Amino acid sequence: MSQSHEALILIQKMVKVPPTKALLLFNTATYQGLQHTSHSISFILNHLLSSGMLPQAQSLILRLISGRIPSSLMLQLTQAHFTPCLTYTPLYDTIVNAYVHSHSTDQALTFLHHMIHEGHVPLSNTFNNLMCLLIRSNYFDKAWWIFNELKSKVVLDAYSFGIMIKGCCEAGYFVKGFRLLAMLEEFGLSPNVVIYTTLIDGCCKYGNVMLAKNLFCKMDRLGLVPNPHTYSVLMNGFFKQGLQREGFQMYENMKRSGIVPNAYAYNCLISEYCNGGMVDKAFKVFAEMREKGIACGVMTYNILIGGLCRGKKFGEAVKLVHKVNKVGLSPNIVTYNILINGFCDVGKMDTAVRLFNQLKSSGLSPTLVTYNTLIAGYSKVENLAGALDLVKEMEERCIAPSKVTYTILIDAFARLNYTEKACEMHSLMEKSGLVPDVYTYSVLIHGLCVHGNMKEASKLFKSLGEMHLQPNSVIYNTMIHGYCKEGSSYRALRLLNEMVHSGMVPNVASFCSTIGLLCRDEKWKEAELLLGQMINSGLKPSVSLYKMVHKVKEILGFHGMKPKEMRS
């Protein structure tokens, strides 16, 4: 008996029984090796869908997608000439949902487009699930296009808009996000706390904390009650912008409103105290957190360990790591990276390397951050052989050196006057497909200037324009200082004026060195003009420069300038 005939007999049996029994017959035939036809599969899907058995239909489709049930149905459904007797909308809806659940973005889109082409529209739940998948998969532009194409056809709800607003905020498209907020109201829907919290969080992450504050106030006018996450993201936003008073006030407002701070809120507070060097206050908040019964995760401990390391309290930091183990948590790679960074900062490379070996033996894998931290540590203590050994090891672990890795090495070789080696690292960086940035060039130029190689430094400086890179204030000040050391007052003054015309303010050292060199070269008028420029920039001349200027004024015959003017 042929497979198609067996499938036909199966259909005749399934049509006589309820869908649950029909599915059992279908599965039994599958396990016995029956090669289903598109008609037998279409029948059981239609039988399940028409009875409202969506989960069972979706499970069956997932088996088709994975190949556990061999069939050409999925391919045939996308062919225009294939028209089986099915309830199309539920079928396509279920297929799209199945692909979404299996994270098959392209296939989900294929069936969605075919569904629309056939004149069918997905249900709200399917549409929302697909939008979520697209945004999580970094396909925001596709999600935006589909949303606008179907917004007048699909029954949208507040969740639909919330998904898209979150996508806008994550992609930095705030104009679109606020346009969606207005559109939501045009559709007769009311924005909820989650939508406003999403917008507040987005504004804070992109530095517009005042707009976030306005949204928070608008929530109050609308009668929306902020949740712990709303307070936390705004509090964190204030802290990130250096607005400590506002951040702490937000924390107090949260408690006054009767809302118990969550772990995120406490972590923000602890982090702010640690960043400000107030580790004792951070530990008081930590104690309060535990008293309130809020679970302290590894992240909380990592923040405190980082604060202790920045305060050079390494003994306490190590004790806290041991405490992490005692409370049933495990130090993660971030914990080790913080400790390694702390010990590298103070040149304790033996301890840093011991921690590095410890993390590997505990089953953790070093990250690019781990290697860069250790390479920077070795470079700081001038152990370039150790740094290069680590580069070799990271490559063996299939971790490619990054722009930061190469910049650290270039800086180290240039500072130690290994110019050829620094240039070799620069060349390797470009060969690996990485594009050096202004900071990379600044460390190379700095190394050349420090060792008096102004000819090469000047060539590199001029090449920045050819690469469409704008020199920053660090590069200008470095070059000016280099020319002053060389005794070239003309070049130093020219660069200083160029820097000012570019909208940058030279630092005190650049002004002082150039004025001193001009005086040495008896270019009194230029020195006096530059001094006036320095004072007008809001910079204070040093005592030695003050005395030098008096000498300049005596030579020029100008005795009218008051000491007060010099000290302003």
Task: Please place each PLM-identified region on the residue numbering.
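N-terminal targeting peptides
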Residues: 1-159, 168-179, 183-194, 206-214, ...
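Pentatricopeptide repeat
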Residues: 3-7, 22, 37, 41, ...
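C-terminal interaction modules of eukaryotic adaptor/scaffold proteins
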Residues: 504-505, 510-568
